[in-house]
Regions:
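Class I S-adenosylmethionine
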Residues: 1-76, 81-82, 163-168, 172, ...
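Short loop/turn motifs at secondary-structure junctions
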Residues: 28, 50, 100-101, 143, ...
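Mobile active-site "lid"/loop adjacent to the S-adenosyl-L-methionine
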Residues: 62-63, 70, 74, 81-82, ...
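General small-molecule cofactor/ligand-binding pocket signal
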Residues: 84-87, 183, 222
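Conserved S-adenosyl-L-methionine
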Residues: 172-188
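Flexible, glycine-/basic-rich loop-and-beta segments that form/coincide
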Residues: 180, 190-250
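Extracytoplasmic/lumenal ectodomains and periplasmic regions of secretory and membrane proteins
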Residues: 230-276
Length: 276
């Protein structure tokens, strides 16, 4: 069943994959997809947030089997739950093969779920986060749809932003304009990218500013369109992202200012975690 808004807020605030959902309108909580659903935390997050229909896409059948076997612990979210449909599939292929469009695309902590040898993760091909992938995700979103991607640390988030912006650029959309579609939340452990199919409304921007006032963030990694320069310090706004929104910095400039390689990547060289 559904939970009340106040209870949902309490449950969503501790997890960065859920925090942006506090800004999503109630009438845009119909169709959601989790790419790399793993053990199901993102599925539970969407259930708490009140989404009506959730496609849980997981390429590893072992994860699906474990969650089903532990139904008493997991709440049976992979066991014929009335609001969840489980798909054993690769995320991008799944989205390409369907005509369905989503109010929300959620991807949380995929490296922990997919890389057996964490020490070699930089050499692992990952087609989920290339700029080509972001174009496909945008195609899978409804007109007012959003996408949430939870990263692990600062430079992963900046590379996510680079790939998202390159995706827009390939469609002929200028960086300055594309920044109207982007929010970043600089949680110390799980910095998060939020992408919206259309520019964020003033109401949504206010909602994100309220979130930044509520949760602890640090390291100047936040960005919400429309925050005035005088407020940058209060909101821990990232200076590079602010400069891009103002039209004063391009993708090459962002990469040049970073202490690791945060430039965009393509399907031809999909080494997202190769940052050094």
């Amino acid at each position: 069943g559904q939970v009340s808004r106040s209870v949902a807020r309490t449950l969503l605030l501790p997890y960065m994959g859920g925090v942006p959902l506090l800004v999503v309108d109630q009438d845009r909580r119909q169709e959601a997809v989790v790419v790399g659903s793993g053990g199901g935390i993102d599925v539970v997050t969407l259930l708490v947030a009140g989404f009506e229909n959730i496609d849980a896409v997981e390429i590893n059948p072992d994860f699906i089997d474990i969650v089903r076997e532990q139904a008493d612990y997991t709440g049976g979210i992979y066991n014929d739950h009335e609001r969840v449909t489980v798909h054993e599939a690769e995320g991008r292929s799944f989205l390409r093969q369907r005509e369905k469009r989503y109010d929300l695309v959620l991807m949380g902590l995929p490296i922990i779920k997919s890389v057996r040898n964490f020490g070699n993760h930089a050499l692992t091909e990952n087609y989920l986060f290339t700029h080509n992938a972001f174009t496909e995700y945008r195609r899978a979103m409804r007109d007012e749809g959003m996408m949430i991607v939870v990263a692990h640390y600062r430079n992963e988030l900046l590379r996510l932003v680079s790939n998202a912006l390159k995706s827009y650029q390939e469609d002929g959309i200028a960086i300055e304009e594309a920044m109207e579609h982007i929010v970043t939340i600089g949680d110390p452990l799980n910095p998060t990218l939020v992408l919206k199919q259309t520019p964020f409304t003033e109401q949504e921007r206010r909602g994100f500013r309220t979130i930044l006032e509520t949760i602890p963030t640090r390291g100047q990694l936040n960005f919400v369109p429309g925050i005035r320069p005088a407020e940058y310090q209060n909101y821990q706004v990232n200076p590079e992202l602010a400069a891009m929104a103002a039209g004063d910095l391009d993708l090459q400039g962002l990469a040049a200012r970073a202490d690791e390689d945060v430039s965009w990547i393509s399907d031809n060289s999909p080494f997202f975690y190769q940052l050094s």
